[in-house]
């Protein structure tokens, strides 16, 4: 067991804050319409250029263990904001740094950290309520395009394409992003389906940066029962390995030995595979699996019809152009199903909707209908170079997530204005003691920082602009950093999704509270010895690299 380095009190917190400063300084330059790019060295290939806060944060690992602990805590605020709302990562980073730094100063001055935390929590909850009160629902294509434009750092084309994609498949529809083979940026609607089941093991992930499993041109095996032993599947698995194509297994469940064997073979490269649970429950699960079978031109392997896994041939497997699996969802794009069969299935579901008297059944049938007939909108992002395409694709993905958040919870005035004006009612909050009051004041000051940073990235004095805006009673009055003018932010179309602003603040406060209430830090002591790398083991011979 490695020896440990133990630090206590203000020394531990100060070193953690040094790590937080290093990460925050790298991330904050990306904030706002005039934020700068960050160039990140890759382990192979050309460097990555990005203006996405969470991408910058994820790339940072510090040599000093204690400073790194602080940096990793701050990174978790950005990552959580990205997971929940898809955007607001830089705002979360700026807020968390401000809250943690001011909180630590007060702890060092003798304030009670637990009361400071209570005061901060009271203030954050009050600001969240203010954000909810001031949010405005969006409906029009123009408003959707505005959110997409702002979230992609002012790229109008991205905003317009996202609005067009939502018009094609609906606001709740499935929209994916992929790289184009040319210079253009297009929206294409293809046959596809999304269901709410993710991968059964993170070891199936092929893209570790986004934590998704991406299968190109896969076979799809649909099995009605649980899979706990792969012995009956050996003939079909060997046929798939020979074809050199990936395999997606959709079953009631894949467990125990079967799951372990698939994972081992996936890691050793013998079999490109992923497994997910079938969507739905009971009879509805079977119906949805039949929908997938029709969409992908496969067969549902069901013992009711006397079918057995050992007798299944590759002809019984469905196929699709691409499958993307995240922790929570599976998207099947461009299944190779027969158009006539899909249309017949759609008509069958429509007639079931007309006949049913249960509101619940009707709702579930309509969900199936939407999945089968709605299709998937694909945003195809092109560019002159690989670096440009990847950078733009990142911005499109961020903008799409932010637009979905805006549709869900509405929008508020952007540019840091909502957080700034939400700080004003906090002075009226009633607390039990001066330490809790100090916690509220920490939040009031921190809420100015995102706007200050946006203004400073545009080359102006942030403190002067903040002072000028606080003199105004209009909560939508703000500073347009793009045109360097004071405007009504809502009328000017400078808006942020309420969910993004809310999540950024809550995640930042959570991380800052952890830091100011930390008294002892334990990390591994740095070691000069380098461990020998483990040799890679191959699969067993005679099975095409598979190991069963």
UniProtKB/Swiss-Prot annotation:
Signal peptide start-end: none
Q: Where is this region: Disordered?
A: 527-548
Q: What catalytic reaction does the record list?
A: ATP + H2O + a folded polypeptide = ADP + phosphate + an unfolded polypeptide
Q: Which ranges are annotated Gly residues under compositional bias?
A: 538-548
Q: Which Gene3D superfamilies match?
A: GroEL, GroEL-like equatorial domain, TCP-1-like chaperonin intermediate domain
What EC identifiers does the entry list?
5.6.1.7
Q: Give any Gene Ontology cellular component.
A: cytoplasm
Q: Where are the transmembrane segments?
A: none
Keywords in alphabetical order, please. ATP-binding, Chaperone, Cytoplasm, Isomerase, Nucleotide-binding
Q: Which SUPFAM superfamilies match?
A: GroEL apical domain-like, GroEL equatorial domain-like, GroEL-intermediate domain like
Query: Can you name one GO molecular function term for this protein?
Result: ATP binding
Record GO biological process: protein refolding
Q: According to the UniProt record, what class of enzyme is this?
A: isomerase
Q: Which InterPro entries match?
A: Chaperonin_Cpn60_CS, Cpn60/GroEL, Cpn60/GroEL/TCP-1, GroEL-like_apical_dom_sf, GROEL-like_equatorial_sf, TCP-1-like_intermed_sf
Q: Where in the cell is it found?
A: Cytoplasm
Q: Which family does it belong to?
A: Belongs to the chaperonin (HSP60) family.
Primary role: Together with its co-chaperonin GroES, plays an essential role in assisting protein folding. The GroEL-GroES system forms a nano-cage that allows encapsulation of the non-native substrate proteins and provides a physical environment optimized to promote and accelerate protein folding.
The UniProt entry, under PANTHER family, shows: 60 KDA HEAT SHOCK PROTEIN, MITOCHONDRIAL
**Description of how the protein assembles with itself and partners:** Forms a cylinder of 14 subunits composed of two heptameric rings stacked back-to-back. Interacts with the co-chaperonin GroES.
| Protein name per its UniProtKB record | Chaperonin GroEL
- Origin species, per record, is Rickettsia conorii (strain ATCC VR-613 / Malish 7)
